[in-house]
A protein has these predicted regions:
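Catalytic phosphate/metal-binding cores of nucleic-acid and nucleotide-processing enzymes, i.e., regions
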Residues: 2-165
């Protein structure tokens, strides 16, 4: 088990959080990242000191190591560029499988929590997925594809991350 110093984590989905159905920005013909949503994410990070860990399908070709960034696809590159534009960066991503077993989104989060020292975490996602089955709904701030991340979500996320501080 890899344990580092205790940290706060934002498990971040992208679609329906950092973009909406009406987002004009595009990435390879698909909906890209809405720059108007980035200040909301930045506020959460600034007020909690949390790190961003991807749970989104946007993580598929995202690379943590600088020397592997050339392997990234357009989605991962856009994510890095947009986050960097407001002083943010992705810290890590959840695993899709371990020991040959594929994970659900919830299981990927539980695996991450098992291998890292996390003091508090929040999940920003527009879908429920299997979070209730893994007893993670108390940490879920559920957005929607119409509005994405809003000030109300920001307030709730900060409360969850700073609980007990």
């Amino acid at each position: 088990m890899i344990k580092t110093n205790s940290m706060k984590i934002i498990f971040l989905d992208v679609d329906g959080v950092l973009n909406t159905k009406s987002t004009k920005a595009r990435c390879n013909g698909y909906i890209g990242i809405d720059e108007n949503k980035l200040p909301f994410l930045k506020e959460i990070v600034d007020k909690t000191g949390a790190e961003i860990v991807l749970v989104s399908t946007w993580k598929e070709h995202w690379e943590k190591l600088l020397e592997r960034k050339y392997l990234q696809d357009a989605f991962a590159n856009q994510l890095d560029e947009k986050l960097n534009s407001v002083g943010l960066k992705v810290f890590d991503k959840t695993e899709d499988k371990r020991d040959g077993v594929w994970y659900s989104r919830c299981e990927g989060i539980l695996d991450y929590l098992a291998y890292h020292k996390v003091s508090s975490f929040v999940i920003l996602d527009d879908f429920q997925f299997d979070y209730d089955g893994c007893d993670l709904t108390d940490n879920l701030v559920q957005t929607n594809e119409k509005d994405g991340l809003t000030p109300e979500h920001v307030k709730k996320a900060i409360e969850i991350l700073n609980l007990g501080n």
